[in-house]
Amino acid sequence: MIGRIAGILLEKNPPHLLVDCNGVGYEIDVPMSTFYNLPQNGERVVLLTQQIVREDANLLYGFLTPQERTTFRELLKITGIGARMALAVLSGMSVQELAQAVTMQDAARLTRLPGIGKKTAERLLLELKGKLGADLGELAGAASPSDHATDILNALLALGYSEKEGLAAIKNVPAGTGVSEGIKLALKALSKV
């Protein structure tokens, strides 16, 4: 399974990307939340991915944050929600907004998303309740510890640390810290473990 892609962004045409990794071009679909935060064509990009193998296709879905990928995976577990619908949910609202809607059992908020009717919204609320995880629940009520958390996490992943280690280390980085200083603080926290 392909869990992460790092390479040069060649093309972006919502919601599709083409990323060159050592001469191989990977087509990746991303939610709009990820799409709007991508670098320019020709720049390096790191995406966490979810590979879906079907009888007629081998598909890759990409995300800038571990929370988006985790939420995508949880959405796929729900009956009647496929990859396209899960991508539409993450394109229509942030992970924090989804976690908040689930916590508040706000079906009306979910029905505003394209392709989500009342029954589907109620199923989402029922099946996601308590499954978004502690990290996502914390995100629903609070801002991330650092404004550059995604960049810092991607750097830690590139250095070979796991997502879990990276997320734990980022909690030690104060808000407003720059990327390079944040990486240093995160590495310092990881060296103490």
Curated annotation (Swiss-Prot):
Return the similarity comment.
Answer: Belongs to the RuvA family.
Record's Gene3D superfamilies? 5' to 3' exonuclease, C-terminal subdomain, DNA helicase RuvA subunit, C-terminal domain, Nucleic acid-binding proteins
Which stretches does the entry tag as region Domain II?
65-139
Q: Taking the first listed entry, what is the main subcellular location of this protein, grouped into a coarse class? A: cytoplasm
- GO CC: one term? cytoplasm
Quick one: where's region Flexible linker?
A: 139-143
Q: What is the lineage of its organism?
A: Bacteria, Pseudomonadati, Pseudomonadota, Betaproteobacteria, Burkholderiales
| Naturally occurring in which organism (per UniProt) | Burkholderia lata (strain ATCC 17760 / DSM 23089 / LMG 22485 / NCIMB 9086 / R18194 / 383)
Q: State whether keyword DNA repair applies.
A: yes
Top-level taxon in the UniProt lineage? Bacteria
Q: Which SUPFAM superfamilies match?
A: DNA helicase RuvA subunit, C-terminal domain (SSF46929), Nucleic acid-binding proteins (SSF50249), RuvA domain 2-like (SSF47781)
The UniProt annotation puts the region (Domain III) at 144-193
- Chain spans, region Domain I: 1-64
CDD domains the UniProt entry points to: UBA_RuvA_C (cd14332)
Q: Which keywords annotate this record?
A: Cytoplasm, DNA damage, DNA recombination, DNA repair, DNA-binding
The question of whether DNA damage is a record keyword is answered with yes
Task: Give any GO molecular function from the UniProt entry.
Answer: four-way junction helicase activity
Relay the domain remarks.
Has three domains with a flexible linker between the domains II and III and assumes an 'L' shape. Domain III is highly mobile and contacts RuvB.
One Pfam short name: RuvA_C
Please identify the protein, giving its name as recorded. Holliday junction branch migration complex subunit RuvA
What is the protein's quaternary organization? Answer: Homotetramer. Forms an RuvA(8)-RuvB(12)-Holliday junction (HJ) complex. HJ DNA is sandwiched between 2 RuvA tetramers; dsDNA enters through RuvA and exits via RuvB. An RuvB hexamer assembles on each DNA strand where it exits the tetramer. Each RuvB hexamer is contacted by two RuvA subunits (via domain III) on 2 adjacent RuvB subunits; this complex drives branch migration. In the full resolvosome a probable DNA-RuvA(4)-RuvB(12)-RuvC(2) complex forms which resolves the HJ.
